[in-house]
């Protein structure tokens, strides 16, 4: 039952999201804006849509939960918050992310979304929190007819959106990709350039054993990474961020490396 749900996970998320708006009775302008953005993106399976959903949906859930005490936990607000949280949990599963990134693949590509590095968890949350706070502030000032304040915060929100959304979207563009020629590590966050590993260069792929000495290209993340062993030394160019995390130079010659996809490519 659960596996069948995950196979068609896009539909349960859509149904839950529609149910949220059907049972709610307290949406403000900002909540409606976030709900509409996420709802529209849920029908467009693509990495851009995944970013839009994962940026907008948490705001709806956060507002629904924050309103529970003021509503004295009446049934309708509780149901609204519960549906929003369940939808949010599904949205952040590896299966849901995989549906979106694979739908944007070309030809015979098979994309595996990479896990977020631990070091980016706090900056990512803070970037989202800034956007959320600014949007809610614009909504509040508009409701109170404080037009000057609303305009000022609105300008700041527009600039922050332009700067931060692009950075957040990069997390949805990090993939391990199976292509006819081999594998590609497509990661503009941790690598200075994408890395193509041809099939004949690969000696083996397996879950990394404890104590492995392979270079970690995952940026340190949760879960067990995949270890790729190469036939000969191969150049890999690190981004300044990964160089700082690994405390190495920006160009390495490696025979073993680690990547951390959200779903195993070893099946």
Where are these regions (language model features)?
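Hydrophobic alpha-helical transmembrane segments and immediately flanking/interface helices
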Residues: 140-161, 213-236
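Hydrophobic core segments of alpha-helical transmembrane domains in multi-pass membrane proteins
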Residues: 29-37, 76-86, 149-158
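Anionic N-terminal interaction surfaces
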Residues: 103-177
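Membrane-anchoring hydrophobic segments
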Residues: 1-72
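A membrane-cytosol interface segment of integral membrane proteins
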Residues: 221-267
């Amino acid at each position: 039952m659960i596996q069948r749900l995950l196979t068609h996970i896009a539909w349960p998320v859509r149904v839950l999201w529609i149910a949220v708006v059907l049972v709610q009775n307290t949406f403000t302008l900002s909540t409606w804006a976030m709900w509409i953005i996420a709802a529209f993106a849920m029908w467009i399976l693509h990495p851009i849509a995944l970013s839009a959903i994962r940026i907008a949906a948490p705001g709806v859930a956060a507002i629904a939960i924050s309103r529970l005490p003021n509503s004295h936990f009446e049934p309708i607000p509780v149901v609204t918050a519960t549906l929003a949280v369940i939808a949010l949990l599904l949205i952040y599963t590896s299966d849901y992310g995989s549906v979106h990134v694979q739908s944007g693949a070309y030809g015979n590509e098979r994309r595996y979304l990479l896990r977020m590095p631990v070091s980016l968890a706090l900056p990512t949350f803070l970037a989202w929190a800034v956007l959320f706070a600014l949007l809610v502030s614009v909504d509040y000032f508009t409701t109170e007819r404080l037009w000057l304040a609303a305009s000022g915060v609105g300008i700041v929100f527009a600039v922050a959106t332009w700067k931060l959304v692009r950075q957040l979207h990069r997390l949805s563009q990090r993939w391990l990709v199976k292509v006819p020629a081999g594998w590609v590590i497509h990661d503009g966050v941790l690598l200075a350039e994408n890395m193509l590993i041809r099939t004949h260069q690969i000696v083996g792929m397996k879950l990394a054993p404890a104590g492995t000495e392979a270079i970690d290209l995952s940026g340190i993340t949760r879960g067990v990474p995949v270890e790729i062993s190469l036939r000969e030394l191969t150049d890999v160019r690190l981004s300044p961020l990964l160089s700082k995390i690994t405390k190495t130079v920006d160009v390495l010659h490696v025979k073993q490396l680690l990547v951390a996809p959200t779903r195993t490519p070893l099946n």
